């Protein structure tokens, strides 16, 4: 069986993950002056974000390509110990755990894909398919969507639009079936793993750009907490997760953050927001250490 055929068999399952994940980086864009000097391909990852609608609010979440661009630009070596152990999925017995770890494995798959780790990616895709089937969320996609992804797999712009549309399909499916909590948990798991990977890389390289990108997660974290808060009393698992994220948010209060708002351009049909605002972040080594410890503790609770 060819590798393309194998990936086609599993790719549909991961699509549920990739488009929902606030993977690794913040929504902040760069200045127009800096952007004009770059090619369209380089500009896309840092200026495209997706909109997640929750109740009557729209939350911008980073595009899946921001992390890939940053890590590739830095030529950071692959670390096989960063990703969550794949065998853990057999121990997830509740929908809460399955949804959170679906998000985590989706982020891990993105990390593996950066380094073209095809054998590992296939294994993670298999587990993701298993979990998504158990959660009953694979039904929101059809064959035409998978065919479109396959045809456009090397076109970042087209893929981002497809993923945004697929988010709309799954979001609608979860809402109709009164399962919005599952979507929020997938988002949470993906964000937690994203920040965990960034902190591991930031501490290992002491790269200032990466460390400051970690600091930029302050506002996405606030958004995530707001999305999860309605479920605080749904279960002890929810309240523990939210309390941990709130505790983490207090650590971000020590990050120096300035923000200059500029009107964004919004593509309502595809739920894409082009960020034009500018931000400046300074994160100390102390806050990097405290954030790293707290996000690792939250992650360990999720994957354990």
What are these model-predicted stretches?
Residues 28-31:
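Bacterial signal peptide processing site
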Residues 232-304:
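A cross-kingdom marker for long, charged
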Residues 23-26:
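C-terminal motif of bacterial Sec signal peptides marking the signal peptidase cleavage site
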Residues 106, 110-113, 132, 136, ...:
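A structural signal for well-ordered alpha-helices, especially hydrophobic packing surfaces
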Residues 122-127, 144-147, 185-186, 211-215, ...:
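Short, charged, amphipathic alpha-helical segments
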Residues 2-14:
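Bacterial N-terminal signal peptides that target proteins for export
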Residues 155-242:
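Extended amphipathic alpha-helical interaction segments
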